[in-house]
Design a protein with these regions (language model features):
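Conserved SAM/SAH cofactor-binding pocket of Class I
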Residues: 59-143
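A short glycine-rich, Lys/Arg-flanked "PGG" loop and its adjoining helix->strand segment in the class I
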Residues: 154-167
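Active-site capping/gating segments
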Residues: 174-214
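Short strand-turn motif at the edge of the Rossmann-like AdoMet-binding core
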Residues: 105, 170-174
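Residue-level signal for inorganic ion chemistry
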Residues: 32, 170-171, 206
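Class I SAM-dependent transferase core
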Residues: 1-68, 74, 108-122
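Short glycine-/small-residue-rich Rossmann-like dinucleotide-binding loops
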Residues: 146-147
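Conserved beta-strand segments of alpha/beta enzyme cores
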Residues: 99, 123-125, 166, 187-191
Length: 214
């Protein structure tokens, strides 16, 4: 069962999180586990730790969202809806107009996301499309978790989006080295915070992304 402890260190999430919201997160995690028997949403080895490994890990990204000027978040290759659905659930009572756009090319996973969105009455848009084929997209936040390497995410942001404010990424223990390597081809600013669910991981917010001229 999920309780308030699983987000106790997230400074924004912990403020006024209703019992109803926590219950929705719990039901969402149970839905993932149930559906995981039919389609591969998450690794079966992480089912027992889904609250921390997936739900809380996704929830902590809300610390990087400025709720006053952020209206749209786009989740690339969302899979089971992590972190997009978690953010939609958390933001629903705080800012109902906050919209999460989720890209997932799998038919079965997209249908699961639609069922979840309908069940919890979430402000989402589910796109069963290949993000690499989309052009002139607009959003406030681009977010990606366990989808593609950082250089690929940067290329998608640069080529497929004509407008965005920043990118939120989940990085592992080599995150600093990955950003350093990316800086050889890209100019960007970033803020980082240590992951609340893994001592070796980082959550980073990338802004002012520009490709360096050769």
């Amino acid at each position: 069962m999920i309780d308030s402890d699983f987000i106790k260190n997230s400074k924004i999430v912990i403020q006024n999180v209703s019992r109803e919201t926590l219950e929705e997160l719990k039901n969402y995690s149970l839905s993932i586990i149930k559906k995981n028997k039919e389609i591969n949403l998450i690794s079966s080895s992480t089912e027992k730790s889904i609250n921390t490994r997936h739900i809380a890990d996704s929830a902590q990204t809300i610390d990087f969202i400025n709720k006053n000027d952020i209206k749209v978040c786009t989740d690339l290759g969302t899979g089971a809806g992590l972190p997009g659905i978690v953010l939609a659930i958390l933001m629903k009572p705080k800012k109902p107009e906050f919209k999460v756009i989720l890209y997932e090319k799998s038919h079965h996973k997209s249908n699961f996301l639609k069922e979840i969105s309908k069940k919890f009455k979430l402000n989402t848009e589910i796109n069963q499309k290949n993000i690499f084929e989309q052009k002139n997209l607009q959003t406030d936040i681009i977010i990606s978790r366990a989808f593609k390497p950082v250089p690929v995410i940067f290329e998608i942001a640069s080529r497929n989006f004509k407008k965005f404010k920043y990118i939120i990424l989940f990085l592992g223990k080599s995150g600093k080295e990955i950003l350093k390597e990316a800086s050889k081809k890209w100019k960007f600013d970033y803020e980082e915070k240590k992951s609340l669910t893994s001592d070796q991981s980082l959550i980073v917010k990338i802004s002012n992304l520009q490709k360096k001229k050769k």
